[in-house]
Amino acid sequence: MSVEPPPELEEKAASEPEAGAMPEKRAGAQAAGSTWLQGFGRPSVYHAAIVIFLEFFAWGLLTTPMLTVLHETFSQHTFLMNGLIQGVKGLLSFLSAPLIGALSDVWGRKPFLLGTVFFTCFPIPLMRISPWWYFAMISVSGVFSVTFSVIFAYVADVTQEHERSTAYGWVSATFAASLVSSPAIGAYLSASYGDSLVVLVATVVALLDICFILVAVPESLPEKMRPVSWGAQISWKQADPFASLKKVGKDSTVLLICITVFLSYLPEAGQYSSFFLYLRQVIGFGSVKIAAFIAMVGILSIVAQTAFLSILMRSLGNKNTVLLGLGFQMLQLAWYGFGSQAWMMWAAGTVAAMSSITFPAISALVSRNAESDQQGVAQGIITGIRGLCNGLGPALYGFIFYMFHVELTELGPKLNSNNVPLQGAVIPGPPFLFGACIVLMSFLVALFIPEYSKASGVQKHSNSSSGSLTNTPERGSDEDIEPLLQDSSIWELSSFEEPGNQCTEL
């Protein structure tokens, strides 16, 4: 992906206009560009929540049709192909997230919210037009599938430090809420009217989300934080997907947190990519039961990430809340691995809902251990780790299913049918048990994370620094804008020494 200077910048280089004409031209350009950036009201967490809700509601509608199309397209090695498709998408997201983040720090959040939602939802109508193109576009759409990253930057722009823990929890809960009813609605429409109508409704919802961003969402990044010219230089170090990972070893606390995130999110990413197929193939869930299961877990996750998270953070503390979430994750993965009956899946689903507190708690822990002007780098590291897991996790789970000969040989087996494979196996779900072992290692690593620490020795950005945003004005003291990813030459993570006040998640 290349970033070329806009035509007006090249014209400026060819013939420099008079000095007195520059402010007038610049003001006119800013006035023209500010019209579509205004939206309705002041930027808030509610705008971000609606964008997330609509995007994942559209994809939730396609849960049942997607399982059918996946089986029809890849009748052999279904789990493996699903893992590879999702793995390619995740790796592309990991590679593109820093560039999109750096550009959003320059040009604002709204243009990139619009772009990420559009390209993420672009494959939806292709499901009925051409399944092969649909899966190909899903893989390629990973380049822009970083809506959550831009949303988190948007939320950080509009909240104070002490509000971010709650705000991240609400955004994560909104994601869960979008999956409460959409799979059930999609399953009903599919059974009553066919998959074509489901795809049409999902496409309409995606278009509604795009229109909402275009018309209603205001820009969250203040104009004075953006460069005067849209042709401002961007350091390519900001676009390096491995730049944030290189900072991990510079501080022991950051290293421990990142290892914890990697070991906990790797099995979670794999689980998200294959679990609905697993419920249908191994356990024998039909479309209605899968939709009901998603709704139950979604509702409980909302309660866990809103009410329970706040209570646990106050009573147990940040670190112990993370440990509790990892404990729930371990239990639910082991239960999925050994469970062979439907009731076991329902019981494990309640535990899975409680494990959803882990990522918001980790986000709060990261923010708590970083100074206010280091938030972009600290959260950027976590974003990079999760992006890497989104690529590796699905491929890992697909490979393990393939190694243990778990295939989608029959679509929608009847519950308690003798044809359902692995019902009598000692370990019906090998990838989930493997994931539980990985989370156990994550739990052991998290034990060594200090409860309180604060970064110090921050190296501030100088206006004379080369390769950075030379036209970006200084930050006002009354504003706390958190960039998605910062240039490694701007911020350096130093050793965490002094305890400080608490501040702060698809």
Swiss-Prot record:
PROSITE patterns: MFS, SUGAR_TRANSPORT_1. Belongs to the major facilitator superfamily. Residues 1-49, 104-111, 156-168, 218-255, 303-319, 363-387, 450-506 are extracellular. One of its GO terms (cellular component) is membrane. Residues 459-474 have a biased composition (Polar residues). The chain crosses the membrane at residues 50-70, 83-103, 112-132, 135-155, 169-189, 197-217, 256-276, 282-302, 320-340, 342-362, 388-408, 429-449. GO terms for molecular function: transmembrane transporter activity. CDD domains: MFS_MFSD14. Glycans are attached at N463. This is Hippocampus abundant transcript-like protein 1. The keyword Transmembrane applies. Keywords: Glycoprotein, Membrane, Transmembrane, Transmembrane helix, Transport. It comes from the Eukaryota. InterPro entries: MFS, MFS_dom, MFS_trans_sf, Sugar_transporter_CS, Tet-R_TetA/multi-R_MdtG-like. Residues 1-25, 457-481 are annotated as: Disordered. Residues 71-82, 133-134, 190-196, 277-281, 341, 409-428 are cytoplasmic. It is a multi-pass membrane protein. It is found in: Membrane.
